[in-house]
Amino acid sequence: MRTLAFFQTLVMTGLLVAASAASVVATRSVAAIKADILALAQSFAGQGDPDFSRQEALEKLVAELLAAAPQPPVAARLDLLAGPWYQVWGPYDYRGGDRGTVDPKITVDEIYQVVFRDGYYYNVNPVRGKSRIALLRGEFQPVPGYPDMLKVRFTRFPGNKGRPEDIPLWELAALAEAGELPAGTTIVPGFIVRWFFGGGFLREVYTDADMRITYAGDRVDDRADEHIYIMTRARSGA
């Protein structure tokens, strides 16, 4: 009897320890995980990632976030997705070469993506060394059978000569769409963009009111080719 009681005590102790450990894990809030993701992304700002080590460090936290806050399909998140986003960290080379490098023409601390609910977005960024704002337009649509994926096709690449002093950069996107840029120009003709820029896929893994985490890749099923973006909601004065 004493032996049985001893083993019962061991089992109960083990269960209590496991429950206690689970409680500790459960107390880590979504806000705390997001804060860690943001702090780590900010520490990587302006840096390339040729060996994917920075992305892998972020992905551990992203996995924890998704376990704590599972996401509905991206089609149900389009209202949240809409609006201007600031790139805290992600790829800094969009020329089709090694995405682990940093394109010297990119102003790494002023990269924005402005998403419109109607199925298009603009990448907005000042061109380093030139008095010009680049606005690359892409159209997107959900991918059947892939609930978090958007297929992207680039369509136009306008720009604005000079930097407006009275509006945030991301507001140029709506003006570009309306053909009302204050000093509009064409960086690359539309037919060249449509023929040669192609497109790709965005895997929207997390969206809320102030944070967005997405992956960009060339193929729908190639996770090894994906590159992560950590974004926060762009706001005036922020």
Task: Label each PLM-derived region with a short phrase.
Residues 7-8, 53:
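Compositionally biased, low-structure terminal segments
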Residues 25-238:
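Soluble ligand-binding/transfer domains with enclosed cavities or grooves
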Residues 1-6, 14-27:
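N-terminal chloroplast transit peptides
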